[in-house]
Amino acid sequence: MLAYEELKGSNGKEIWFRPTRFDARKLFPNNPPRVRVKSSSYQLHNISLTGIAVVAKQASEDELTVGETVSIVFQQAGLSIFEGRAKVCRTETTPFGSKYAFSLVDSYVDFDRLLSRNVQAQIAANGSFLSSERNALVPREYRAFCSDVLGVLRSYRALLDENLRVTANFPHTFDHVGAYEACEGRMVEQWRSLWLTGNDIVREVMGSRDAREATKEFTELVLTPEMRAGAIWDRSYMKPMGYPGDYQIMNQVYDWERLGDNVYQQLIHRLGLEVAECIGTRMHVVRGKIADTVRERGQDRPARILSLGSGPAREIETYLESPQSRGGKAEFTLVDQEPQALGQAYDRIYPALIKLGGLVRMNSLNISFTDILRTHGGLNQVPPQDMIYSVGLLDYLTDRRARLLVARLYEALAPGGLLIIGNMNETALSNLWPMEFIADWTLEYRNDGEMRAWAEGLGAQEYWTETEKTDRVRLLFIRKP
C-alpha cells in the first residue's frame, strides 16, 4: 500500500484534467446516433461530459470555423435525443474525412438520460418502422432484399445448430471442419448473388443524402448485427482504432484464416473475406512491380521504393521472403500515420533484412497523410524515388484532394520512376453495398476515365489503368520520363 505522500499525479500537459471521452461505437454498440449541425449530418466519434467530436465522411455542405457557436442535435432513427449549443474548438482534415471537435456552451451530457433516450428512440423506430416518414425513404425492394439475406444466413445457422444438437446425443464429436467445408462453397456462391443484387438496389439511393442515410440506418439495424458474427465484419463496423480499414483488417485478409468460436461465425467471416479479397490481390500486383523495379533499377545502387499508407506492408515482406529479392539492391520507405502498423511491419520485415546481408534497407516515417500534401511536408525527407505506390488511401479522398496528392507523389519520382495508385473500381460487383451499407465503410468508387484524369497535365511519359484479378480495384500507373 502506498503512503499518501507517495501518490503521484500527472506530468506535462496531462496535469490539465479533462473529463473522460467515450468512444461512440462502444457507448452505442448497436447504432450510434447521428449529429446534426446546420444542414449536415455527422458521425459521432467520441463524447464526454462537456464536448463531442464528429466525423464527416463526405464533403460537408456547411463551413464550420473555429470559435463559431452552433446548434447541435443528436438524432437516433430520425428522432431528437439531445439538443444544445456548442463552440467549434478544433477542425482537422484527414483522408478518412473531416473531424470537428465541439465544446458545449450552456449544457452538459447527462449520460444516463442520453442512453435512455437513445434506447427509447430505437424502440419507437422499431415500433413504427413501416409508417415513419424517415424510413419511408428506404426502398420497399431493399426491405424485402434484406429479409432474403437474413433468410439465407439464418438457414445455415439453423442447419448447423440442429446438427450440433443431434451429435450431442452420440459419442462422436461434431465435425466442425467438415461442416465448414460442406457449407462454404454454396454459401459463398449465394452470397455473391445477393451482393450483386444489393449493389443494384443501393445505387438508386446514392444520389440522395436522406435516402442513403435512411437506407444505411435500416441496414445497420436489421442486417449488420447478423454480419458482426464474423470477425472481419465486426472490426470493420466497430473501427476500434478510430478509422476504417486499419492494418489488422488487412492482416485478416492476408492471413485468410477461419476466425470465430463456431462454424457459423467462421462462415460469416469467410463472406467478409470474399468481399475484401481484392486487398490481397492488389498486393500481389504491387509485389510484382516491386520485383520489376528492383531488377531494373537496383543493380548499381539501391532501387528506392516508397509506400504511402503502408499498413503492415505484406507485399514487401513476401517479396523479401521470395528468391526474387536476391536480384538487386533496394531501399524501402514506409509512410503511415499509425505507429502500430509501422511497428508490426518493422518486426516482420527486419529478420529478412538481416538475412539479405545489407542488400536491402528500410526506413519508416510516422507522419500524417495531410503533411504529404504540404510543399515542405514529409516527402522532402527522402530522395527521388524509383517507385511510389499508394493502393489503399486515395479512395477516401475527394477528387480534388486525390488529384493534388497524385501530383505531389509524381514530383517525388526520380526520372523514369513509376507511380502506382489504387482505388476501388466502379463495377457491377464493387464493394459498395457490403462496405458502405453493412460495415459503414465509406469509399469513393472510380472508373478508368476518372483516375486517368489525375495524370493529365503532369507531363508523364505514359499512363494507364488496370484492374486486379477480382476487378474490384483499379490501379493507375504513371511513368515519369
Regions flagged by a language model, labelled:
Residues 1-49, 57, 119-136:
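N-terminal helix initiation/capping motif
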Residues 28-37, 64-81:
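Short conserved beta-strand and strand-loop elements enriched in small hydrophobics
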Residues 52-56, 92-106:
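Short, solvent-exposed secondary-structure boundary/capping segments
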Residues 67, 127, 150, 154-201, ...:
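Class I (Rossmann-like) S-adenosyl-L-methionine-dependent methyltransferase catalytic domain
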Residues 86, 110-263, 289, 293:
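N-terminal accessory segments
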Residues 300-311:
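Conserved class I S-adenosyl-L-methionine
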Residues 375-388:
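A short acidic, Gly/Pro-enriched loop at the edge of an enzyme's catalytic core
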Residues 385-400:
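A short SAM/SAH-binding and catalytic strip from SAM-dependent methyltransferases
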